[in-house]
């Protein structure tokens, strides 16, 4: 295939600005699917993506377009996620392309994730075509949005394309702009194979499938390939493309994006960003890989049935293959049994993984309170990274604790600026900058990550009636007043309910958990003490009173000492029960208490 007729491009935008709908129209225009097969969000393959109206996994499709100049072009489209948790997917997609369609909702304007994604595209040396979507809405204001793009992003928006992806207006103009304005890929077909591994996933029938972009050379069935990071050798079984259906082809050459299967059994051999070359004719040096994405939010996941542990482990392995940023390791809890400590890119990422485990693998799960990574320095000088309360150690042995902070960019209409700033201040934030573009404020804050990952995104959406948008990136670790909150039931610590929290909020949280447990734990024949503690100091306590059996019911008249003797005997019996009895905490009580910790 002549690489001058290939165009590789990504669609980037803020969440809900119409990326996936635009992709649907491009596929429809190029006859990628017939009318019967077309459906909304055709590239969003997971049910959860369609239900939430979001893109989670970057998807690729090859379109064949007959342009007005009479030539046939092969367009490799990468649809990317818009939510901040999945920005790593965007980075990988951009590395496989030469250009980007920057989609902006013409009624909403530039939003925080728009800025973040377009800067990634600029860093990747992309040619960028601004596309103003939803022009059929009454609130659409294309001229205002063009000025906003030039003011905030600094690219020429005078020739922005005006489209309505929903109704199909302007789709032909988008396709013509792609072939005329975006560059074709560069490379040498006679050079040794050099391809970058863009993504992997597990297919029930094909095993591990690799999505790659060919930089130099060709790849074909039967060829022996090498993963340059670990020298693992495999023989290619199948070569194919997505149209968006899987289609087997003879080979992939320079500039093409497609998939291969090679009977790969080891997940560790498939590293995202790795360079693939030919065994007999290796390339000189590997391609620069992607920036490694590290988890920032951690929580423990336990099966509600002990016999489901192995099924959960296999399910996590399959999800990890499809999501390199997701990590897990075995964990044992006294209260919840065997499970896994899992790492995620954010709370939406956590919710999506948990929902996929429950839906796709039919697992019934309990998740503990999410947390972030703290850097703990002990008095002996040892520095440890801690994300599990169980590993926190004793308070008296700790010299210093640092917590991760982020730089948050919030775009909000000026009428909601006051409530958003109040929220940031309540979250221990530090204001860095405030600027305006028209009646939109661009607010920059430095915030503790632990305050952002839980409900911050939902809160700014709620306070601004849905108009505010958020993007953030890691900043640095700073000294902080952090404590481990332990929950004790009859003086026995419950590991599943422990959490790491800022000292300013620890008493309130401790009281809330104790009150919730008091309502949830059934009464016993003896008194139950529920306590919240920091180290050896009790900061909150609730008591569940015991059942009382009337041991004097059979007495009538007689000596009062007989009555006192029976009551004293009952008192001693309850004391003995309390010292040897384990409190039966219902599984539901853990789940409800964990919701408070969240």
From Swiss-Prot:
PROSITE patterns: G_TR_1, G_TR_2. It is found in: Cell inner membrane. It is a peripheral membrane protein. It comes from the Bacteria. GO terms for molecular function: GTP binding; GTPase activity; guanosine tetraphosphate binding; ribosome binding; translation elongation factor activity. GO terms for cellular component: plasma membrane. InterPro entries: EF-4, EFG_II, EFG_III/V, EFG_V-like, EFTu-like_2, G_TR_CS, LepA_C_sf, LepA_CTD. Residues 4-186 form the tr-type G domain. GO terms for biological process: positive regulation of translation. The keyword Flavoprotein does not apply. The keyword Oxidoreductase does not apply. It is an enzyme of class 3 (hydrolase). GTP binds at residues 16-21, 133-136. Keywords: Cell inner membrane, Cell membrane, GTP-binding, Hydrolase, Membrane, Nucleotide-binding, Protein biosynthesis. SUPFAM superfamilies: EF-G C-terminal domain-like (SSF54980), P-loop containing nucleoside triphosphate hydrolases (SSF52540). Its EC number is 3.6.5.n1. It catalyses: GTP + H2O = GDP + phosphate + H(+). Pfam families: EFG_C, EFG_III, GTP_EFTU, GTP_EFTU_D2, LepA_C. NCBIfam families: lepA, small_GTP. Belongs to the TRAFAC class translation factor GTPase superfamily. Classic translation factor GTPase family. LepA subfamily. Required for accurate and efficient protein synthesis under certain stress conditions. May act as a fidelity factor of the translation reaction, by catalyzing a one-codon backward translocation of tRNAs on improperly translocated ribosomes. Back-translocation proceeds from a post-translocation (POST) complex to a pre-translocation (PRE) complex, thus giving elongation factor G a second chance to translocate the tRNAs correctly. Binds to ribosomes in a GTP-dependent manner. This is Elongation factor 4. It comes from Ehrlichia canis (strain Jake). The lineage of its organism: Bacteria, Pseudomonadati, Pseudomonadota, Alphaproteobacteria, Rickettsiales.
